[in-house]
Amino acid sequence: MTEVLVLLDKFNFRISCCESITVGLFAQEITSIAGASKYFSGGFITYTNESKINIVKIKKTTIEKYGVISKQCAIEMALNTQKILKTNIAISFTGNAGPNALENKPVGLVF
């Protein structure tokens, strides 16, 4: 994670996140490093479909058509977070933590 902060510093960038499957782990990890507030603007934990729609403004049609465990949803999560928090970079995490398949998709992550 320190390498990420070095790169953010080099380009004078700020980062944000939108987390579902990781439930705040990325934000916790990046903010555990001293000085992270210079680079990290904040993030959203959107564990439910409702929070994705209401907080990060994911289109309901995206969820209905592709599901929350999809590249399309992950991209929309990142782009909307970037716009809301006005950062250079936003990262999103969605996926299926298991133990069973969700949306007919295996356990795993989509970034």
PLM ranges: what are they?
Residues 1-111:
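Short alpha-helical segments enriched in small residues
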